[in-house]
Amino acid sequence: KAQEPWFGIEQEYTLLNSVTKWPLGWPKGGYPAGQGPYYCSVGAGRSIGRDIPEVHYRCCLHAGIQISGVNGEVLPSQWEYQVGPVEGIAMGDQMWMSRYLMYRVAELFNVEVTFDPKPIPGDWNGSGGHVNFSNRQPESPPAGKQSRSSAKKLGKRHRWHIAAYGEGNERRLTGKHETSSMNDFSWGVANRGCSIRVGRMVPVEKCGYYEDRRPSSNLDPYVVTRLLVETTLL
């Protein structure tokens, strides 16, 4: 507890047509134009189902969940919301409640939600549950050295973490579509293709966070946050 572990989780998900079980707004039995124009987009045909994440955002605020943002993702009809920063085990509490609210909101629109890490096979992005992590250490080394030390510890237990980071994650962690390969461990500054991404300003400001990009969208937040603390702080 003295370390004050703080977490922020980026929860990605995909909206599905409740009848066809195909992504919302996609041609029946077909595909939309390729990825590129959908990420953080605006406009009909690009930003699909926006009402759902916006209503969900407001529900989370009313429920006391520390939701901190929403954005459209790379796959059309894929969205993300962020919860945090939250300290310790409360991260798991808030993430599970936010998921419940997402299901309830989507129900009102007669839309289904999937947290599958690779809802559409092929040349399409999967869905992750990236975990941002930081902690307070009064006598800690500079953040750059601390990040390197944590990365080395995480690298030694890479397979252990991968086994607990979500069901079906092997379909997502291929080394393509802004992921690292699940068979290799890597870290870097502002690099989305790494297992661990260190914030761009960490080397400059000598403080900050790092992002574990390996967890899938169906991660158990209690398990993942516990593993990060066990591996890097205990």
From Swiss-Prot:
EC numbers: 6.3.1.2
A biological-process GO annotation: glutamine biosynthetic process
UniProt GO molecular function: ATP binding; glutamine synthetase activity
Residue ranges of domain GS catalytic in the record: 1-234
Keyword Ligase: yes
Cross-referenced SUPFAM superfamilies: Glutamine synthetase/guanido kinase
Keywords per UniProt: ATP-binding, Cytoplasm, Ligase, Nucleotide-binding
Catalytic function, reaction form: L-glutamate + NH4(+) + ATP = L-glutamine + ADP + phosphate + H(+)
Official protein name in the record: Glutamine synthetase
